[in-house]
């Protein structure tokens, strides 16, 4: 199946969803050589991954993951692709805690650092939040505390077959897209930041076909896989079974533009300190970007009707002490 897929890819032909699914199944099962795996990943990257191919690969990867079921709960994820080179602090992790304090159920899927100094797993460990949760513990944490971390490497064990090849290739592959598309929990919504504007609409199509009810796939004009405060953010939103593309700016929400340097982070320890400062009410650009992204989670999490209301609520959550209180509850 994989060899047939490679032959099509080198002719720059698009794989069907089932062909991509079959090829990825073989990879996940560890049935292929590293040479064939590298050829498949390189060929896809050169050709450009299409919606059907991403969908098929995501389906295979999810089927190989350890499952987490949150019955009768509408939970969302805020996992992004990473790889944006922005060197920001862990914005989505911070915004997730704020949103959870506002009543959103967060199934935060993530991993240790890839291209940055601090992945979500790294900063949460530094914050004292448990990352090594079993499926039943994830379910209980989401139900009782409103947020739990799903450590990707513990739930996607088949990825061990891929790790050496990805490291050897040294460039972005389809797996950079698959991470945020393969949350082991049966989420209903997602805020998904991507490293390239060209990916927002295609990945929204994938999420829609995966059955998500609400989602925002977004990319900042500066390349951030977050809603940025340096300028415009491109958004592809899933709502009522359709995808709408639009642009938002910080001033639309009464937030002043800042420089990318103003939201830079560092080591997991430094980023943990930044997050605690924000949750305790410290102002400035770092709070602003956390508030904007928390607003997206509050909106997709069905707590607010729009982003403007989300911004107001996120500010109130922080200023009332509820955000820091939620953090204390999580540790």
UniProtKB/Swiss-Prot annotation:
5-phospho-alpha-D-ribose 1-diphosphate binds at residues 80, 83-84, 88, 90-93, 108-116, 120. It holds the Pfam family Glycos_trans_3N. Pathway: Amino-acid biosynthesis; L-tryptophan biosynthesis; L-tryptophan from chorismate: step 2/5. It comes from the Bacteria. Its EC number is 2.4.2.18. SUPFAM superfamilies: Nucleoside phosphorylase/phosphoribosyltransferase catalytic domain, Nucleoside phosphorylase/phosphoribosyltransferase N-terminal domain. Keywords: Amino-acid biosynthesis, Aromatic amino acid biosynthesis, Glycosyltransferase, Magnesium, Metal-binding, Transferase, Tryptophan biosynthesis. GO terms for molecular function: anthranilate phosphoribosyltransferase activity; magnesium ion binding. Mg(2+) 2 binds at residues 225-226. Mg(2+) 1 binds at residues 92, 226. Anthranilate 1 binds at residues 80, 111. It catalyses: N-(5-phospho-beta-D-ribosyl)anthranilate + diphosphate = 5-phospho-alpha-D-ribose 1-diphosphate + anthranilate. Binds 2 magnesium ions per monomer. One of its GO terms (cellular component) is cytosol. The keyword rRNA processing does not apply. One of its GO terms (biological process) is L-tryptophan biosynthetic process. Its cofactor is Mg(2+). Anthranilate 2 binds at residue 166. The keyword Glycosyltransferase applies. Catalyzes the transfer of the phosphoribosyl group of 5-phosphorylribose-1-pyrophosphate (PRPP) to anthranilate to yield N-(5'-phosphoribosyl)-anthranilate (PRA). Homodimer. Belongs to the anthranilate phosphoribosyltransferase family. NCBIfam families: trpD. This is Anthranilate phosphoribosyltransferase. It comes from Clostridium acetobutylicum (strain ATCC 824 / DSM 792 / JCM 1419 / IAM 19013 / LMG 5710 / NBRC 13948 / NRRL B-527 / VKM B-1787 / 2291 / W).
């Amino acid at each position: 199946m994989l060899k047939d897929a490679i032959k099509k890819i080198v002719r720059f032909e698009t794989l069907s969803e089932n062909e991509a699914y079959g090829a990825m199944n073989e990879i996940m099962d560890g049935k292929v050589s590293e040479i064939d795996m590298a050829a498949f990943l390189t060929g896809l990257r050169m050709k450009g991954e299409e919606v059907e191919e991403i969908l098929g690969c995501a389906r295979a990867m999810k089927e190989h993951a350890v499952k987490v079921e949150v019955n009768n709960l509408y939970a969302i994820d805020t996992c992004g692709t990473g790889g944006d080179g922005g060197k920001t602090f862990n914005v989505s992790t911070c915004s997730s805690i704020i949103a959870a304090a506002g009543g959103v159920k967060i199934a935060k899927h993530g991993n240790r650092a890839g291209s940055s100094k601090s992945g979500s797993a790294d900063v949460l460990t530094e914050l004292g939040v448990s990352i090594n949760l079993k499926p039943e513990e994830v379910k209980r944490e989401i139900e009782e505390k409103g947020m739990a971390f799903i450590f990707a490497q513990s739930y996607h064990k088949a990825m061990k077959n891929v790790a050496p090849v990805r490291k050897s290739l040294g460039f972005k592959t389809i797996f950079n897209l698959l991470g945020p598309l393969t949350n082991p929990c049966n989420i209903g919504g997602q805020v998904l930041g991507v490293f390239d504007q060209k990916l927002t609409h295609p990945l929204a199509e994938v999420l829609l076909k995966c059955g998500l009810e609400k989602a925002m796939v977004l990319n900042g004009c500066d390349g951030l896989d977050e809603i940025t405060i340096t300028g415009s953010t491109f958004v592809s939103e899933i709502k009522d079974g359709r995808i709408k593309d639009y642009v938002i700016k910080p001033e639309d929400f009464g937030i002043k533009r800042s420089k990318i340097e103003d939201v830079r982070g560092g080591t997991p320890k430094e980023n943990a300190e930044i997050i605690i400062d924000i949750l305790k009410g410290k102002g400035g650009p770092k709070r602003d970007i956390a508030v904007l992204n928390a607003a997206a989670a509050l909106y997709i999490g069905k707590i607010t009707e729009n982003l403007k209301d989300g911004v107001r609520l996120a500010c109130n959550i922080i200023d009332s002490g509820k955000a820091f209180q939620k953090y204390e509850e999580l540790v």
